[in-house]
């Protein structure tokens, strides 16, 4: 395998000494190792299409060996996921991944098809997928974590579910040390910080609580927080930027520095454009698309929000205030999802924006492509977007 990955060839004499291993899963004329190297060089955007070829291809695309080869070849890339929760459905959320459509023929006369970006959301059949909440999902490496969720949202939970994005299977990880209500998760240095409300034994009141989950050791511990934070306003949302965990409590933000184990109240500027619940961190920069549908980024040096400017000749997406918007880090780019209603159905749109920092106080965005990627029934629903690395 190492020789194939490095591009070396095997001499005919060695081939005679060693019986060639025949693939029983794909092409009978090719060895398994060679097939793995070939598929590993293909962009992960085409994997949903390849999975339709046969059951053997689906098995190959889910094998850990394939992703080991991708890592050896330096072919690791981000894979964008969308989890859609439809409140009228009782079978759990639906999962989709961004992929490329099959190549269109050059003889196509469909003008609308010719203008298409070529991207689409493909549904992933994931059996027994647990329910999710707005802020219960976090991606670390090739895994997506779903934390503190129950079938009934008004109940507390300490559950930790892990989705292996290689095989698209769920497994249950060790539970948190405490049960939490209304969780919000954020990632910093391969660790997941879980903020939520906790009810102490023998008490009727709920207090803020923070638990850190080490994704490498799968060990979680509670973080000691000041009384003013635990008994103050409820932690609505959280994020991680500037090497700190940022907790929005009421109309103020409290920062936790895990290196120093210290807490600091930093005012209310950061949370000004976070209450729309439409924000994400890309390249250690916090981006937001608030209810006014203006794209902004947070300057941690001077603690102020700045507008995301567009490159000359370009234009950022214009979104309706009524649209449900979700942002995600897509390999260092900003992925934007929003919906538009059309009759009994609605279209889910996606735009990918490349980001370029010109100086300390200016970031420019360039829309690489924008297109509708999915049709779903027009029913009450919400969706989360996030990306794993495979």
From Swiss-Prot:
SMART domains tied to this protein: FBOX
Renumbered residue ranges of the record's region Disordered: 1-27
Kelch repeats: 143-190, 237-284, 286-330
Pfam families hit by this protein: F-box, Kelch_FKB95
F-box domain residues: 24-70
Keyword Repeat on entry: yes
Keywords: Kelch repeat, Repeat
Source domain of life: Eukaryota
Taxonomic path: Eukaryota, Viridiplantae, Streptophyta, Embryophyta, Tracheophyta
Name of the protein this chain belongs to: F-box/kelch-repeat protein At4g25710
CDD domains, per the entry: F-box_AtAFR-like (cd22152)
